[in-house]
Structure formats: C-alpha cells, structure tokens
C-alpha cells in the first residue's frame, strides 16, 4: 500500500473543573452517630451534631438498600443505594441538613453483618479529586457518580447550563436527579450541586428548560422553567414543572404537578421538550410516547393541549422513542428556505447496535409535523457507537448547539470506571444541507473546540510502503491529540493509521475504498470484554470516486 499523507497534530488541553463543594474528607471529631439495628430489615442511624455529610461505602455488586433522611415529613424520599456488604469500592456523600442538632437516617434491607456498618464516616467535606485513569481529558464528566442523558440545556446571561441524568449515590443508574454544570465557552465546566432531586413522585427523568422572558408562568421575567418526567411504579410517567429564580442554581417544584399525564394511560411517556413557536405566539411540547412523538401546546406554560402525533411506522422502530427535540434551520444557509428537523433517540435495535440518534426532516405548521421522506427512510445523526440522547440548547438565538451522551445502553453500566460513569460528547453545531436532492442534518464540533489547541507540529509528506512508523509526536501531550490528515490514495484500496502504546494496545482507523467504509477497530484497545459488541465498527460512506483521491 502506498499513500502520501500530510499530518498535523494539535495537543489537547486539560479542562479546568471548578468544584463547588469540598475537596477532602476527614473523620469528624465533634459529631457522633449510633446504630440502632432492628434485625436485618431496618437500621436507624442517630447522628448528634451532624457534619455536612455522612460518607456511605458502596459495593457495586451489592443489592440496593433504601436510605431515607427521616424528617417526619410526607416528602421524605427513599434513595436506593448499594451499601457495601463484603468490600468497599468507593464512598459517596449523603448530605445532612445544615444547622440541625440531631439527624435520623432509616436504612432498610441491609443485614447486620454487612461491612458498611464498620465503614460509615462523618465528614464536613468530600474528596472529588480524580482517581480514575480512564476519565476523558476534555469531555464533560460528572465529578463522581452516574451520568446519562443531557437535560434542560439552556443559555442565559452568558452561561450554558448543562443539566443531566445523575445518580449522586453510585456509579450505576439509579436515583435519577438532575445534575448541573455551567460553562461560559462550552469547553470548561464548573460543577454545581444537583439542581432537582428525586422525590415522592418518582425519579427525575429527562426533559428540557426554557427562559420565561415575558413572565408567562408568573414566576418572574427571566426565570428558568424546567420540564421533566417524574417516573415511579405508583404514578407512572408524568410531566412536571419546576422553576428557578436564581439563574438555574436551585429549583422549586410546581405545587400542582403534574402538568401533563398520558390520556390513555401509556406506560412509556417521557422526556418533554418545550420550545417557542413564533407564528402562533405559543409554546409547544413534544413528549416521547412509545414508538411515536406527541405534540401539545400551551399559552400559560402550565396547561397543555394535545395537538397531534408523529412517528408510527417511521424510521427505525425500536423498543421506545426517547429524548425528542425539534429545531427549525435554514437549508444550505438560505434563511428563505427553512425546514424542521425532528430528532428522535432510539434504543435498542439500531443499525450499529444498541442506542443511537435518528432524525426526520419536514414541515411543522404549529399542529402537525409532516415528514419529507417515506416511512422506510432512516437518517442517522451520527454513526459512532457512543452517541445517544442528543438534545439542543434553548435560548441561543439562531445558533443550534446540541450535546449527546457519549455511551451506549449495551454496556454503559459496566464500563471499567468506578469513581464516575459516562461522559458527554463534544457540543456540536447543527445545520441542514442538500445532497442528491435530499436534505440532511449536519453536526460539527462547535468553533470553541479550537480553543483547546495548544502546541502543534507539522509532519512533512511521506510515502507509505506497507506501513510507516512515527515513534512519537508531542510527547508532553496531556492525554489528548487532534489529528488532521491529508491522504492521497493512489492505487491503495485500504489506507489508514493506528494509534498504539508500549503495552500492545492499539486502535486501527482506516478507509476501505472498494467497500466504501470507514472502519474503527478498537477490539485491541485495552479492556474490551465489557461490551456486547466488540467487533470493528464500520460506517458506510457516501462519496464519489473523485472524493477518495
């Protein structure tokens, strides 16, 4: 194989993570706690002069126990926590009320001989320094705990708010809260306290946020309204509202929640997306409803009326449509020719296994979405294996910025990390373009990504005969590179490159020109036995023969 490539490498920058709570933990000398064990079914923890936290030891393979802060109120909520039975994988902080003289925790379903009773600690702080060698360098991750879908993305007063599905009590799915991070440039994130906590209505599932500029809901002009799904066996999946008067730091739940229930009692009814429809001066909500999307409208942001549905029989029909979004964009930059893109996240059953993001292009008249394509046409927003739950920021003007979850439900709970699980893909700007008389949705990393570049190095052109070995480039690389390659195929049918280390681990990325495929083979990249699909990932390409030169 002979190729003539030109390579430019730009060193990535380590993101600065500002932590808004403690950095270390230590055993308190002022506070005490006692255990009142009532068999294996109930243990009551009595704490005198409580610290900020009680640190709970976690064993990921242990059964869940129910932990409740007992204040005597009807709103007291059980959290499902995998307390250590025979070993401690890590600790998580359980916040205790400020200024309380005594605190009571009720812990159910944990045997008296469990290791956790010996390992529980009281502390005023909690160590969030990174301990995981597999944490991404420049992607947003939670400081600790589990994260999946991005939620409530909204821009206000110079800040991008990234809320997300979050379990603060372990690095596996559960106890859904809305975690919260903010950024001024979409690259460097400040971690804040969780914004919306699980309550007696259920888990806080995915949703969206808007800025109520005109005080339509009555909570003050400029307040942030969050719409989310409360999910529980008792109440099913219902849509709820919370509002913030302090720039999204804290939220108050609407006293008349829920604002919307499924009229037909549908089990899978979640992930509300709310957006402004200017031609009729109204708000529109999309809710995923089994294998379709349902549309509603409102003029007061509290009472919602059914409009229509879309999706039955369209595109890939998996177990469930999830995390909808819909944006209007100019086609090929022409502001006089606009189309709507309906984003639908689907799981499982996707072309490349597990979960992914498809979309539909069409028209929306304020009541119905009409797709341009036939039902059997499927369009994927991204062909990567780790791309799901893509949703867009609101209140960004003409700019449409989306953030995906960088994982896959095939293996997300068992990736080889402990302190945290999951990351967000880079924010990307969306657009519409035409190809072969059809319209497609494009997604490119936001321009702010270039600000991560530091030192760069150009490699002079060279000819490859079978292979060409570059020993080392940018050795002080802080764990990340950007590679830009210009490859002339010549007579080669397969061309690409390998990234490898001295442990024998490698990733192969190459073009198979006869089959028109881009292949990423990460089956030898290190720990790979946790996934259900460890075969090379192949992407079918659309290009002419001239484009391959």
Cite the ranges covered by each PLM segment.
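Secretory/extracellular carbohydrate-interaction modules
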Residues: 468-522
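Bacterial Sec-dependent signal peptides at the C-terminal "C-region" and cleavage site
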Residues: 21-32
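Conserved small/polar residues in nucleotide/adenosyl-binding loops
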Residues: 543-548
